[in-house]
């Protein structure tokens, strides 16, 4: 099971599998690794993404139109590993796509494609025991989400945590935010007190100032919507073989602003 404890401040990016195209997702993963990513979340596109804001919803729509599904997303993770991605890969999926597969087949796919972690944002703690137990048996980190509303269950969640704890910075859906409620900072400190694994903060991280602020009180950040939005902006250049290399380099340089390779020029 992967361990991020010895890393510097964590930079955990999120991309939607198959957006804008599956092969380009592999190249984006390599760019993110080059940009200093500690681990990578790949999101399974879903028709009813309750936790996702408009940016990731649009990415899911594009990926679904390209035929992406949970099986292909897992296989895409395996392709990333075969093409030189050595950082941990975490599958981010809603529970319904998992239910569509036989449990044995699902975990065989994860194992065969060298997937390191699993994050299911809409599965309540009380219903996750079987999935957590199977993940432990398969040496896959089951990533726990904690939100300000789950404070009363904080001790239980952090005791069961593997890999890292994903601390939700704000209530509502994912998306870029200009500022956070002041109460979130005391909540993150409380999560740190309870957790024996690193605590990474996500939902709304969109600039270096926010990264620096969260790094002061946590072990790092998860960045999703800002990166997915950049992919959307670069889509035309990414799908064009003649401009792809330049677009990937631009994406990589942008991603560096969130991680340990950031430098003021």
UniProtKB/Swiss-Prot annotation:
Q: Which Pfam families match?
A: Trp_syntA
| CC annotations in GO | cytosol
The record's keywords, sorted A to Z, are: Amino-acid biosynthesis, Aromatic amino acid biosynthesis, Lyase, Tryptophan biosynthesis
The yes or no answer to whether the keyword Lyase is present is yes
Q: Which class of enzymes does this protein belong to? A: lyase
Report the PROSITE patterns cross-referenced here. TRP_SYNTHASE_ALPHA (PS00167)
Gene3D superfamilies, sorted = Aldolase class I
E.C. code: 4.2.1.20
Q: Where is the active site?
A: 41, 52
> Could you tell me the superkingdom of the organism this chain comes from?
Bacteria
Q: Which residues form a coiled coil?
A: none
Give the reaction(s) catalysed. (1S,2R)-1-C-(indol-3-yl)glycerol 3-phosphate + L-serine = D-glyceraldehyde 3-phosphate + L-tryptophan + H2O
* CDD domains xrefs: Tryptophan_synthase_alpha
Q: In which pathway does it act?
A: Amino-acid biosynthesis; L-tryptophan biosynthesis; L-tryptophan from chorismate: step 5/5
Q: How does it assemble?
A: Tetramer of two alpha and two beta chains.
- NCBIfam families associated with the record: trpA
What this protein is reported to do is described as: The alpha subunit is responsible for the aldol cleavage of indoleglycerol phosphate to indole and glyceraldehyde 3-phosphate.
Name the protein family. Belongs to the TrpA family.
Protein known as: Tryptophan synthase alpha chain
Which gene codes for it? trpA
């Amino acid at each position: 099971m992967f361990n991020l404890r010895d890393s510097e401040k964590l930079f955990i990016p999120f991309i939607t599998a198959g957006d804008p195209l599956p092969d380009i997702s592999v190249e984006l993963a390599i760019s993110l690794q080059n940009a200093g990513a500690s681990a990578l979340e790949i999101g399974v596109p879903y028709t009813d993404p309750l936790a996702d804001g408009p940016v990731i919803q649009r990415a899911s729509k594009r990926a679904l139109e390209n035929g992406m599904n949970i099986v292909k997303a897992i296989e895409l993770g395996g392709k990333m590993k075969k093409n030189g991605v050595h950082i941990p890969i975490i599958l981010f999926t809603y529970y319904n796509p998992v239910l569509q597969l036989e449990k044995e087949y699902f975990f065989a796919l994860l194992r065969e494609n060298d997937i390191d972690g699993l994050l299911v944002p809409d599965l309540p703690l009380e219903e996750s025991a079987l999935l957590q137990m199977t993940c432990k048996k398969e040496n896959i980190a089951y990533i726990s989400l904690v939100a300000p509303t789950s404070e009363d269950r904080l001790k239980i969640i952090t005791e069961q945590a593997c890999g890292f704890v994903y601390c939700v910075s704000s209530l509502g859906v994912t998306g870029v935010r200009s500022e956070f409620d002041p109460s979130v900072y005391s909540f993150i400190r409380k999560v740190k007190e309870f957790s024996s694994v690193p605590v990474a903060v996500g939902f709304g991280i969109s600039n270096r100032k926010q990264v620096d602020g969260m790094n002061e009180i946590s072990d790092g950040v998860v960045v999703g919507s800002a990166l997915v939005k950049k992919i959307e902006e670069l889509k035309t250049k990414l799908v064009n073989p003649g401009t792809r290399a330049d677009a990937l380099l631009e994406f990589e340089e942008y991603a560096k602003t969130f991680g340990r390779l950031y430098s003021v020029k």
